[in-house]
Design a protein with these regions (language model features):
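Conserved AdoMet/S-adenosylmethionine-binding subsite of the radical SAM
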Residues: 84-236
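Conserved Radical SAM active-site core
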Residues: 3-15, 27-133
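A generic structural micro-feature
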Residues: 23-25
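A short beta-strand-turn-helix
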Residues: 16-21
Length: 236
């Protein structure tokens, strides 16, 4: 399967509220892109990249733009999977605010040619900086608890951008030490960092000791509203 500039594979499209980050609570249209270049051990959307996970649908840019244009929400959220595998700059329409959730391993303004497993290849041109700089980017760089390797070149790119915030998901207090080292290494301001708690149950999100530690270190706490309200239900 060859995925190029004019092909978009989508796992699901739905309306809900943004659950995390600097726009938590806003009414949004979510477009969840299929495929990811990572395989994080605790991923809560494995159906977007696990080969036997089920169906996805192919769209053209014009088909997705029509859905976006006719949707009720003002906020449009590209999530995944990994949206940056695709030409997101070709999906904009007037009168909407676009958000992207990325794993921080791919630079959007460079051309990519990535082999994904044995059957899938991503080949897209560089995105237009003028367009993507109008997006609200949520850069979710992975910690060691994901068992994934950092792409330092990509992180250095994101550290220079003014149009993004950083989101981390932690399991324990030791993860905060790793975040501290990360932001010092790449020169990231604490006020741009939002930290949430790993897990897909209500109980996993109500851990006062961890929340106290997050705010005592000067970070923003990011509640994961979708987990608190609906657990791990799809389409939420």
């Amino acid at each position: 399967m060859q995925i190029t500039d004019n092909k978009y594979y989508i796992s699901e499209i739905f309306e809900s509220i943004q659950g995390e980050g600097n726009f938590a609570g806003v009414y949004s249209l979510f477009i969840r892109f299929h495929f990811c270049n990572l395989t994080c051990s605790w991923c809560d959307t494995k159906y977007t990249w696990f080969e036997k996970s089920g169906a996805f649908k192919e769209y053209s840019a014009e088909e997705l733009k029509s859905i976006i244009r006719n949707s009720k929400p003002y906020h449009i959220i590209f999530t995944g999977g990994e949206p940056v595998l695709y030409r997101l700059d070709k999906l904009t329409v007037e009168g909407k605010k676009f958000h992207v959730e990325t794993n921080a391993t791919i630079i959007p303004t460079t051309k990519i040619d990535i082999q994904q497993g044995a059957k899938t290849r991503f080949s897209r041109k560089a995105m237009d900086t003028r367009i993507i700089s109008t997006f609200n980017w949520v850069v979710a760089s992975k910690l060691s608890n994901s068992n994934q390797k950092l792409n330092e070149e990509a992180i250095l790119y994101w550290a220079k951008q003014q149009f993004c915030i950083y989101k981390f998901i932690i399991q324990s207090l030791t993860d905060l030490d790793e975040i501290e080292q990360f932001i010092q290494k790449f020169g990231i301001l604490k006020q741009k960092v939002y930290i949430g708690l790993e897990g897909v149950t209500t109980e996993s999100q109500i851990r006062g000791t961890l929340v106290d530690a997050i705010i005592n270190r000067g970070y923003n706490f990011s509640p994961r509203l979708q987990v608190l309200l609906w657990g791990n239900e799809r389409g939420r």
